[in-house]
Amino acid sequence: MAAKKNAKPKLVAEGRVNAGEELIATLKRRFAEHPHRHPGLDWQTVEARLDAGALAKLTQMEDTFGEPDVALIEGPSTVVFVDCARESPSGRRSLCYDREAWQARKEARPASNVLDVAGSMGIELLTENEYRDLQTLDEFDTKTSSWVVTPRAIREAGGALFCDRRYGHVFVYHNGAESYYAARGFRAKLRVPTA
């Protein structure tokens, strides 16, 4: 039987003892393949900071197809893993912005919302500036879009922000916070504690 095209990675699902080792190997390979995302950092420094809590969160990022990698979006001394999948993580799409927006939908509610999913995973939604910084490292979201942190005034007016890359430029847009689309997910970050 052929494997499903979008089958979920089985890092932890099968309960294998070496799931953490598999994840570390995946992260190490990705780190080595994209040195331009983290100039001046070496893998040993990063790996030394990966405790059980960070690995559990990174596993969830990987399992939802975020392809986390270290990206220098907060300066050279802060190790931050960011979703670096070319398109918005497919395991985190079709979500409205927050719980208030989810509750406001009377019909056709999505499974959940961005802020609750990110919170349950222990990761943080990217800000618009962090999203723009990430886009200087590679080209992301050329076919999809990603929700970003929305300023309070915009959210109180019922809106929410999302970004994408089209025509070689990064754009920020607004939408009703209760909207959700199959091609819109969210990118997040995980700060790794200092050793």
For each predicted feature, which ranges?
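A binding-site-centric feature that preferentially detects glycan-recognition modules on secreted/surface proteins
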Residues: 2-124, 128-195
